[in-house]
């Protein structure tokens, strides 16, 4: 029941967040092609600074971060921190915690990463300017895809939601590795050394029982700055930070229950005035609050705290500054990169996830989970083509300001591929899932 309830809560949040993300992306595209386009571009290139004496936190290579750089390299680190926390949780106690659980989604995710890259390379050959975007169609947007799946409500088997979540998490791991390995340059190892020392410090402090999330986040900001200067993409700092945040609570559940029972048994009874609590009652309630805080691990607590900020602030801002596709202007609006990305997300993801899942089950390597069948897997495989967030992120890393025409084509490919995959995935699942009685 706990798993089912948490999936329901998560799905409800994802529906709202997905709608907000979609609306924000549409707004960005409309503004980018309106008379206000120049204002939009000025907003993206507006320089920011955060000075402490003569030190500017928001600077890199001698210049201030622009708004789009701050959102992509700064705020998106919060998103990747949350992704890292989700990955760590899944590896410890979730669907990736054992070979039996992880095998099918891992194999499906591998197919969902390999085949899109192959299809992309067939359209835009490696070694060409367009070939730099090979990794763009690899990603699956967890929140967006689960949001679409959740529109089907109780008709969706829990196993199907878990399968989609698990292979999307593996996709994220793949995307993070690609960013770390292929989109880093001119590494300044002295900055990385200082960052590594701070990670080690946080790890041992966590082992000693420290649970103050603010402390971990403040040190995380310092590490983020060191990564920003190092040449390794700064968002990776958030992922690594997640793995040094303690996953073990200060109180185990058994001790917590005993403590709460003891507090309740000694809770002062209400007097004649039953509106205002007595000081003794307030003290007991604070004991309950303190115990409740200590039974939730820093990892779970921080993940819960970040969901709202990421879904309703960070990702909408990211969509707004990155989804402003130009439908007119210099160069081809629709080109080879557009086709490569869209086909990679729509056809590549479907073929990769479905075929690798089929091979894994038919070979006897892993059983088909209860509640899943080849029809509903086909729908979820299509939803895997909802790349959006990480795909747009990798598109910016692939082409950036050096190739604005190709970047615009890539963005159009991501948006069109994501929309088509979402619509087709929803329609297929609507047809094949059991009708609500």
From Swiss-Prot:
<keyword id="KW-1133">Transmembrane helix</keyword>
<protein>
    <recommendedName>
        <fullName>Na(+)/H(+) antiporter NhaA</fullName>
    </recommendedName>
</protein>
<feature type="transmembrane region" description="Helical">
    <location>
        <begin position="186"/>
        <end position="206"/>
    </location>
</feature>
<feature type="transmembrane region" description="Helical">
    <location>
        <begin position="65"/>
        <end position="85"/>
    </location>
</feature>
<comment type="similarity">
    <text>Belongs to the NhaA Na(+)/H(+) (TC 2.A.33) antiporter family.</text>
</comment>
<keyword id="KW-0472">Membrane</keyword>
<keyword id="KW-0915">Sodium</keyword>
<feature type="transmembrane region" description="Helical">
    <location>
        <begin position="12"/>
        <end position="32"/>
    </location>
</feature>
<feature type="transmembrane region" description="Helical">
    <location>
        <begin position="162"/>
        <end position="182"/>
    </location>
</feature>
<feature type="transmembrane region" description="Helical">
    <location>
        <begin position="333"/>
        <end position="353"/>
    </location>
</feature>
<feature type="transmembrane region" description="Helical">
    <location>
        <begin position="214"/>
        <end position="234"/>
    </location>
</feature>
<feature type="transmembrane region" description="Helical">
    <location>
        <begin position="412"/>
        <end position="432"/>
    </location>
</feature>
<keyword id="KW-0739">Sodium transport</keyword>
<keyword id="KW-0813">Transport</keyword>
<dbReference type="GO" id="GO:0015385">
    <property type="term" value="F:sodium:proton antiporter activity"/>
</dbReference>
<dbReference type="GO" id="GO:0005886">
    <property type="term" value="C:plasma membrane"/>
</dbReference>
<keyword id="KW-0812">Transmembrane</keyword>
<dbReference type="InterPro" id="IPR004670">
    <property type="entry name" value="NhaA"/>
</dbReference>
<keyword id="KW-0406">Ion transport</keyword>
<keyword id="KW-1003">Cell membrane</keyword>
<keyword id="KW-0050">Antiport</keyword>
<dbReference type="Pfam" id="PF06965">
    <property type="entry name" value="Na_H_antiport_1"/>
</dbReference>
<dbReference type="InterPro" id="IPR023171">
    <property type="entry name" value="Na/H_antiporter_dom_sf"/>
</dbReference>
<feature type="transmembrane region" description="Helical">
    <location>
        <begin position="133"/>
        <end position="153"/>
    </location>
</feature>
<feature type="transmembrane region" description="Helical">
    <location>
        <begin position="308"/>
        <end position="328"/>
    </location>
</feature>
<keyword id="KW-0997">Cell inner membrane</keyword>
<dbReference type="GO" id="GO:0006885">
    <property type="term" value="P:regulation of pH"/>
</dbReference>
<comment type="function">
    <text>Na(+)/H(+) antiporter that extrudes sodium in exchange for external protons.</text>
</comment>
<feature type="transmembrane region" description="Helical">
    <location>
        <begin position="103"/>
        <end position="123"/>
    </location>
</feature>
<feature type="transmembrane region" description="Helical">
    <location>
        <begin position="377"/>
        <end position="397"/>
    </location>
</feature>
